């Protein structure tokens, strides 16, 4: 009898060992699967981060894929110069050279067909080049916080000669700079540091936010993007609302949401390059009247960081991992994402009882 019990005990111990091994393997597998949700207000740089993941972790854009972005580059360039010229009327800025008024008429006459065909004809590129060189147009561009203008306007317009070539193929950087409003949810998969990432980019405009909710289940981490340079801008969809205030309101609702009690929150204070250019010209008091510091990058950026981190109501149990980013700078994003991944690995292993 004793031998029988001993054999049963041995078999039970083996089974228990096998169950433990399976549980551990399942735990390790779960720890390697990462669901990342990219959130943030419109035009905060979420889609650019997704494009960077393709460049960094998936060998970038092929020549054919780059070619497909040509029409978007043309459209962004045309839309940018049109926005500036339209704003000149509202801001009562005159062309330095009166002949540019004819070019402006030509711009509006030619642009519709060019955008529809995904082209930049020679006559239109000449019109755009002359307009962009005008001092009145440049003065209006300098006041771009007073109207809605694509962040990449100067990037494309300054490089018009290259873009207008008949054999033009967009570079990786050109692709990164393109702006297409995200509607719905864009899912990207990639592997990094033995982790299998599923990244979800959702539209930031108010009308798109109702689509977020079904993405929330089982989220490992949220990357919340904020455009630092938007502190003196209003929303495209609500011209009464400051963009930074809208971002803070949204971050508050995400950071303190009961569904995200155990979710890592990573804060990307993005567009640091544009913010550094702008802060010396446009005071932070536009957004934060109580701000008494200098209009210098380090001090102003730290102040914005503290405003966001102070929204966290569970500081004792929840940490916000903040990074200053420039989403169009591949090296910067690579460095930051490396640090983010280390945090995710540590937190995942902790959750699975393996750390």
UniProtKB/Swiss-Prot annotation:
Subcellular location: Cytoplasm; Cytoplasm, Cytoskeleton, Microtubule organizing center, Centrosome; Cell membrane; Membrane
UniProt region (G5 motif), positions on chain: 325-330
Residues with lipid group (S-palmitoyl cysteine): 3
Annotated GO MF terms: G-protein beta/gamma-subunit complex binding; GTP binding; GTPase activity; metal ion binding
Region ranges (G2 motif): 174-182
InterPro entries, per the entry: Gprotein_alpha_I, Gprotein_alpha_su, GproteinA_insert, P-loop_NTPase
Keywords: Cell cycle, Cell division, Cell membrane, Cytoplasm, Cytoskeleton, GTP-binding, Lipoprotein, Magnesium, Membrane, Metal-binding, Myristate, Nucleotide-binding, Palmitate, Transducer
Gene Ontology BP terms: adenylate cyclase-activating G protein-coupled receptor signaling pathway; adenylate cyclase-inhibiting G protein-coupled receptor signaling pathway; cell division; cell population proliferation; G protein-coupled acetylcholine receptor signaling pathway; G protein-coupled adenosine receptor signaling pathway; gamma-aminobutyric acid signaling pathway; modulation of chemical synaptic transmission
Protein name: Guanine nucleotide-binding protein G(i) subunit alpha-2
